[in-house]
Amino acid sequence: MRLHLITVGEPKLAYARAGWDEYEKRLRRYHKVQVTRVGGRTGAQASEAIARAAGRAPLILLDPRGEQFTSESLSAYLDAQALDGRGELAFAVGGPEGHTDDLRARAHRLWSLSLLTLPHDLAMILLLEALYRAATISAGEPYHRGST
């Protein structure tokens, strides 16, 4: 399955760029990965750009109003989407203003990485690490050591 990762802007901090690069490389061993960076001076502009970038793919917005996954439940969700014949899922990290209500209404799902407020750069790394961890769980590989 192809995972389309959409972010507003580039990681700005060196640790974030390094983390993004590392987990993107790891994730590519399990999935086709497409990365799209969009711009937008306002939340509305960024949300419009995210919607255009996602196209017809089911859109999963990282949003504090969303549900939380365990690593195992994220793995199961991704496996179920693949079994249902979805060739692509789009995941979007919004900008500083978050997502618009219109984009939230269009989304296939809202996913909250944490109850904490996270810096944009850190949210991007957490997204990639969570997807990578889910892929290793599905593959039965030893990266994940949590309990099921």
UniProtKB/Swiss-Prot annotation:
Highest taxon listed in the record's lineage: Bacteria
Subcellular location: Cytoplasm
Cellular component annotations (GO), alphabetically ordered: cytoplasm
Binding residues annotated for S-adenosyl-L-methionine, in chain numbering: 62, 94, 113-118
One function term, GO molecular function aspect: rRNA (pseudouridine-N3-)-methyltransferase activity
Record EC number: 2.1.1.177
Pfam family, one: SPOUT_MTase
Keywords attached to this entry: Cytoplasm, Methyltransferase, rRNA processing, S-adenosyl-L-methionine, Transferase
UniProt cross-references to InterPro entries, sorted A to Z: Alpha/beta_knot_MTases, RlmH-like, tRNA_m1G_MTases_N
Catalytic activity field: pseudouridine(1915) in 23S rRNA + S-adenosyl-L-methionine = N(3)-methylpseudouridine(1915) in 23S rRNA + S-adenosyl-L-homocysteine + H(+)
EC class: transferase
Subunit structure: Homodimer.
Family according to the record: Belongs to the RNA methyltransferase RlmH family.
Function: Specifically methylates the pseudouridine at position 1915 (m3Psi1915) in 23S rRNA.
PANTHER family, per database record: METHYLTRANSFERASE, RIBOSOMAL RNA LARGE SUBUNIT METHYLTRANSFERASE H
Protein name: Ribosomal RNA large subunit methyltransferase H
Species: Deinococcus geothermalis (strain DSM 11300 / CIP 105573 / AG-3a)
